[in-house]
Amino acid sequence: MPEPDHHYWMNRAIDLSRLSPQVPGAFSVGAVLVVDGAEIATGYSRETDPKVHAEESALDKLDPHDPRLRRAALYSTLEPCSERATRTRLPCTDRVLAAGIPVVVIAWREPSTFVENCVGVEKLQQHGVRVVELPELADAAMAVNRHLDLS
């Protein structure tokens, strides 16, 4: 099976992130779930409610037991969160692990803007998820978040 076009799908996620309503207390993120070269679900920050994350929104569109998730790649413009400020919601890394998604592709790692020391990548890797980072697309993903102090 050929390697998927990571740049194509990450650019699709970046386009989705532009749909996120910009708010001062949250990142604008896009996410795409892909199986066998086909998009099966998408999401973006605050798509369905003010607290929903992009990965959460995409996963909520599928049955959590959908067998395709075990073959899926999740493209997210930002490292999936390992901790939520909204304590009543599962972190996105936990949702990815529960779904059995084997590959996560990100454009940039979460800075310490809202949560100190996000360990999403490390948590996923510790559980056998292959994480692919595309630093060459980080600037494009970050540009959508210029409303935040990313220093």
Language model features by range: what are they?
Residues 28-37:
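Short beta-strand scaffold segments in enzyme catalytic cores
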Residues 22, 26, 67-68:
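Secondary-structure boundary/capping residues
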Residues 25-29, 52:
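Short, basic and Ser/Thr-rich N-terminal targeting/leader segments
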Residues 41-141:
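Zn2+-dependent cytidine deaminase-like catalytic core
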